[in-house]
A protein has these predicted regions:
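Membrane-anchoring hydrophobic segments
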Residues: 1-95
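A generic structural signal for ordered alpha-helices
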Residues: 31, 72, 83, 98-99, ...
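Transmembrane alpha-helix detector for multi-pass membrane proteins
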Residues: 54-70, 79-153, 173-183
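Membrane-interface segments at loop-to-transmembrane junctions
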Residues: 33-49, 77-92, 116-136, 156-165, ...
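Binding/recognition "hotspot" determinant
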Residues: 5-17, 122-124, 149-816
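Terminal module of membrane-associated proteins
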Residues: 29-47, 106-108, 113, 211-229
Length: 817
C-alpha cells in the first residue's frame, strides 16, 4: 500500500468499476423505459391489428363485390391512377384532420385539465365521442393504405370500392365536424360529467328491474358501489368548479339541473327497489342510554365501553349524496352574491317538488327545502332591502320558494287521488308469494311486515297445499301500512303549511313587507290545496279503520285533528299579519301601483272570504280576530279603488265607475249584515255587539267620521237605484249571501211555522221576523239586500233623521215601531 503502483492500480480499478456500474445503470434505465413503453406499444399493436383486420375485411368484401359486378355485366375496371389519386388525397385530408384534432385536444387538456383531479383527467381521456372520432379517422387511413396496396399489386377495382372509399371520406369530414364541436363542449369542464350521468341513469334503471341480476344481493351491492363512485366523481367535478367566475354560474346551474333530473328519475323508480335490497346503504346511529335494552346497558357497564351504535338502512343515501353536490353549488352562488342563480335554481326545484309529493318522498323534501331557505335567506333579504335591479329577482326567489311547498302538496293530492282502497286490498289477496307482489303499483307491500306475511302464505301452500291465512287478515296487514303512510302524509302537509306561513311571518317581522305579502299570498293557495288533501284523507281513513278487525294488533292513531288545529291557528293569525304588510306596501307604492302587484286587493278579497267562512262555521273567535281590523282595510281599499277608476272620464262609464268604486263599503255592509243576522238566528248577541263596537270606536276616533258614514249611506242608497245589471262582483256577493242562507237552512236551530197565508221562520227575533221571516218554496230563508240590516240596525243611529238609510221594501218601519 506504500507503493505508487498500488494507488495507480486502485485508481484505474475504481474508474473501471464506476464505468461498469454507470453502464449497468444506463442499461437498466433503458430496459425499464422500454418495459414501460412496451405496455403502450402492446396497446398500439393491438389497436393496429384490429384496424388492419377490419380494413382488410372491408376491402375484401368490396373487392368481391367489384369482381361480381365486372363478371356479371362484363365491365372494365377503373383506371388505377384515378383510384390512387383519390386515395392519396383522402389520406392527406385524414392526416391533416387527425393532426389538427389531436393538437386541439392537447391544447384543451393543457388549458383546462392539466391541474384537475385524476378522475376528471381520466374522464377527459376516456371520452367516448373523442376516442370514437379518432378511431374512425385512423381506420380510414389504414383502409386507404390497403387500397393503395391493392392498386400496387394490380387488383381490378370497380364502383363498389370507389363508392365505399368516397363514403368513408365523407364520414371522416363529418366526423371532424362532430369532433370539433365536441372539443368545444369539452372546454367546459362540467361537460365531462355527461358520461357519468348516463352511467347513473343506467344504474338506476338496472337496479329497479326485477331480473336475474337485481334480485342477487351481490349485484345489488355492486350497483350501489358503482353509483357511489360515479357520484363521488360528480362531486369532484362540482368542487373543482367552485372557483369559476360569476359569469359562468349559468353553466353550473345546468349541471345542477341534470342532477335534479337524475334525482327525479330515481324517485320514480325507487318504489320498484325491494326494501331489503343492498342497494340501500347502512348508516350507524348512536343509541340513547334511556332507550337501550337491559343487556346492552349491562355490557356497557361491565366493559366500561359506550353503548354500541346500531346500523339502520339509509334509504335516502342516493338522493342525499346528489343534493350535497347541489348544496355546495348553491353556497357558491351565495358566496358570489348571485341571487339570480338562486332564483333559477328554485324554479328548477318545482318539478321535482311535485314528484317528491307524488312518490312518497315529501317529508325528506320538506327538510331539504327548509335547508335551502336557511342558507339562502341572508342573501335574499340583503337584496330585498336594497333598491337595486336584483330586488325583483329576490322577490321572485321568495315566490318560487313558497311555490315549491305548494307543488309538493299538489303531488301529494295526486297520490291520494290514486288510492282505491277496495281494489288495492282485493288485489293483495290474489298474491301467494312475496316475489309475485307488484311493489311498483302497490308500494305499501314493500315492507318487512308484508314480506313476512307472504312468506308465511307461501309456506302454507307448500305444506298444506292450501292457503290458511284469511283474506281479512291480508287486507288488515296491508291496510295498516297504508294507514301509517297516511300519518306521514299528514305530518308532511302540516310541515309544509307551517313552513310557508313562517317564511311570511319572519319576513314581516323583519319589515320586508312586499316579500312577506308575496309569501303570505301562497298561504291561501296552499291552504286550499290542503283542504283537498284533507277531503281525500278523511274519505280514506274510515275505510282503513273498517279493515282493523283484530284489535289485539294495535294501530297508532292517525287523524287530521292536529292538522285542522294547525290550519285554524294559521287562519287566525294570517289576516292581521297580511293586513299589516299589504297596507304598508300599498301606501309605499301608491303612485306606481301599476308597476307593482295588487297585494291590497289580494288581502281585501281573502279577508272578506275568511269572514264569510267564519260565519259559515259559526266561529265567532275567528270572526272577531279578523273583523276588528277589517273596517280600516275597507276604508283604505275603497280609496285605493276610487283613485284608480276615476281615471275613466267617459260619460257612458259613469255608472260602472260608481258601481266599482263603492263596492268595498257595500261588501263591508253586506258581511256585517250577515254577521248580525247570524247572531240573531243563533241567539248570540256577541255578533251584533262586535259589529256595533267596531263602528262606535270608528265614530269616536274623530267627529268627522260621521260625515264619512253619511257619504257611505248616500252611496249605498244610490246603488239601490243602480240599473247597471250584473256588475263585476255581483255574483260573488250573491254567492256569499247564498252560503249563509244555506248554513241557516241546514242548522239544527232552523225551524218554521205556518200562519194563515205562508210558511215563516220560527224565531223570537223581531229583526229576523221583519227582514227574512217568509220562507221560500224550497224551504230556505232569503237574505237578499243583507247590507240593509247593517245600515238600519247599526249605522242609522249615527245619521241625521233626514239622511237615514232606507230599504227598498221598507221593512224597517215595522222593525222600529
Amino acid at each position: 500500500m506504500n507503493r505508487k503502483l498500488y494507488w495507480v492500480i486502485r485508481k484505474y480499478w475504481r474508474k473501471c468499476d464506476f464505468y461498469i456500474k454507470r453502464l449497468t445503470y444506463t442499461i437498466r434505465e433503458k430496459l425499464e423505459l422500454h418495459h414501460n413503453l412496451a405496455q403502450v406499444q402492446v396497446k398500439i399493436v393491438k389497436t393496429m391489428i384490429l384496424q388492419i383486420c377490419s380494413s382488410l375485411l372491408l376491402a375484401f368484401l368490396l373487392a368481391k363485390c367489384d369482381g361480381f359486378l365486372m363478371d356479371r355485366f362484363s365491365l372494365k375496371p377503373l383506371l388505377t391512377d384515378i383510384v390512387k389519386d383519390i386515395t392519396i388525397g383522402g389520406m392527406g385530408i385524414a392526416g391533416v384532420i387527425l393532426g389538427l384534432y389531436c393538437a386541439n385536444i392537447a391544447s384543451i387538456f393543457s388549458a383546462k385539465y392539466s391541474n384537475v383531479p385524476q378522475n376528471l383527467a381520466r374522464l377527459f381521456q376516456q371520452d367516448i365521442v373523442t376516442n370514437s372520432c379518432i378511431k374512425q379517422i385512423v381506420g380510414y387511413i389504414v383502409f386507404c393504405t390497403i387500397i393503395l396496396l391493392e392498386c400496387a399489386v394490380g387488383l381490378n377495382l370497380y364502383l363498389t370500392t370507389m363508392i365505399g372509399l368516397l363514403f368513408l371520406t365523407i364520414r371522416v369530414v363529418v366526423t371532424f365536424s362532430l369532433a370539433g364541436n365536441r372539443s368545444y363542449v369539452l372546454s367546459d369542464t362540467f361537460s365531462i360529467a355527461d358520461i357519468k350521468f348516463r352511467d347513473l341513469y343506467n344504474t338506476v334503471k338496472n337496479v329497479s328491474k326485477h331480473d336475474l341480476f337485481t334480485t342477487d344481493q351481490s349485484f345489488q351491492n355492486h350497483y350501489r358501489k358503482v353509483a357511489a363512485n360515479d357520484i363521488s366523481i360528480l362531486r369532484e367535478i362540482g368542487h373543482y368548479n367552485m372557483c369559476i367566475p360569476r359569469n359562468q354560474n349559468r353553466t353550473m346551474l345546468l349541471f345542477m339541473e341534470k342532477i335534479l333530473a337524475l334525482g327525479e328519475l330515481y324517485w320514480e323508480n325507487k318504489s320498484k327497489i325491494p326494501f331489503d335490497s343492498l342497494w340501500f346503504d347502512k348508516k350507524a346511529q348512536y343509541q340513547q342510554w334511556h332507550l337501550a335494552s337491559d343487556s346492552e346497558i349491562r355490557i356497557a357497564l361491565n366493559t366500561g365501553t359506550p353503548i354500541q351504535p346500531k346500523e339502520r338502512k339509509h334509504t335516502h343515501w342516493f338522493e342525499e349524496e346528489l343534493l350535497k353536490i347541489n348544496q355546495e353549488c348553491v353556497e357558491k352562488f351565495l358566496k358570489d352574491d348571485d341571487v339570480s342563480m338562486v332564483q333559477r335554481y328554485l324554479i328548477s326545484l318545482c318539478t321535482i317538488s311535485q314528484t317528491a309529493g307524488e312518490w312518497n318522498q315529501d317529508l325528506y323534501w320538506i327538510h331539504y327545502l327548509e335547508s335551502v331557505e336557511a342558507i339562502s335567506k341572508p342573501v335574499i333579504c340583503r337584496h330585498l332591502s336594497n333598491d337595486d335591479i336584483d330586488q325583483e329577482i329576490a322577490l321572485s326567489a321568495v315566490d318560487m320558494l313558497c311555490s315549491n311547498f305548494t307543488s309538493l302538496i299538489v303531488g301529494i293530492n295526486r297520490r291520494l287521488s290514486q288510492i282505491d282502497i277496495e281494489e288495492l286490498l282485493q288485489l293483495c289477496t290474489t298474491y301467494s308469494d312475496w316475489n309475485q307482489c307488484d311493489i311498483q303499483s302497490i308500494p305499501y307491500l314493500n315492507t318487512e311486515t308484508c314480506r313476512k306475511l307472504y312468506i308465511q302464505i307461501n309456506a302454507e301452500l307448500s305444506i298444506e297445499k292450501i292457503r290458511i291465512t284469511p283474506d281479512w287478515y291480508i287486507k288488515q296487514t296491508v291496510a295498516s301500512e297504508i294507514y301509517k303512510s297516511i300519518g306521514t302524509i299528514i305530518d308532511s302537509i302540516t310541515a309544509a303549511i307551517k313552513s310557508v306561513f313562517d317564511i311570511g311571518q319572519q319576513l314581516q317581522n323583519e319589515k320586508y313587507e312586499q316579500a312577506a305579502a308575496t309569501a303570505l299570498s301562497h298561504v291561501f293557495e296552499i291552504l286550499n290545496k290542503c283542504r283537498i288533501s284533507i277531503r281525500y284523507i278523511e274519505e280514506i281513513l274510515p275505510r282503513l279503520k273498517d279493515k282493523h278487525i283484530e284489535n289485539s294488533i294495535i294501530w297508532v292513531e292517525v287523524s287530521t285533528a292536529l292538522l285542522h288545529k294547525e290550519i285554524k291557528q294559521i287562519e287566525e293569525k294570517l289576516p292581521a299579519i297580511l293586513i299589516k304588510c299589504s297596507v304598508h306596501y300599498a301606501v309605499d307604492h301608491w303612485k306606481n301601483r301599476e308597476d307593482s302587484p295588487d297585494f291590497l286587493g289580494l288581502c281585501y278579497n281573502h279577508i272578506s272570504e275568511a269572514l264569510i267562512r267564519s260565519i259559515e262555521r259559526d266561529d265567532f273567535q275567528e270572526f272577531q280576530e279578523i273583523y276588528k281590523d277589517y273596517f280600516g282595510l275597507v276604508l283604505l281599499y275603497q280609496e285605493y279603488v276610487r283613485t284608480d277608476v276615476i281615471k275613466h272620464k267617459e260619460e257612458h262609464m259613469a255608472g260602472i265607475v260608481f258601481h266599482v268604486a263603492t263596492a268595498p263599503f257595500a261588501e263591508y255592509a253586506l258581511i256585517s249584515g250577515l254577521a248580525i243576522i247570524w247572531g240573531e238566528f243563533k241567539e248570540e248577541n256577541c255578533w251584533k255587539d262586535l259589529v256595533d263596537s267596531v263602528l262606535q270606536r270608528f265614530v269616536e276616533q274623530d267627529e268627522g267620521n260621521k260625515r264619512i258614514l253619511q257619504i257611505f249611506a248616500q252611496q249605498l242608497q244610490a246603488r239601490q237605484r243602480d240599473i247597471l245589471g250584473i256588475g263585476n262582483r255581483d255574483i260573488l256577493q250573491t254567492g256569499w249571501t247564498q252560503r249563509i242562507e244555506h248554513s241557516i237552512s241546514e242548522s239544527p236551530k232552523f225551524e218554521t211555522e205556518y200562519d194563515h197565508f205562508s210558511e215563516r221562520l220560527k224565531t223570537d227575533s223581531k229583526l229576523l221576523s221583519e227582514f227574512c221571516g217568509s220562507i221560500l218554496f224550497h224551504g230556505s230563508v232569503e237574505l237578499h239586500d243583507s247590507e240593509d240590516v247593517y245600515m238600519i240596525v247599526s249605522v242609522n243611529k249615527y245619521l241625521p233623521d233626514d239622511q237615514k238609510y232606507q230599504s227598498r221594501s221598507g221593512w224597517e218601519r215595522d222593525y222600529e215601531s
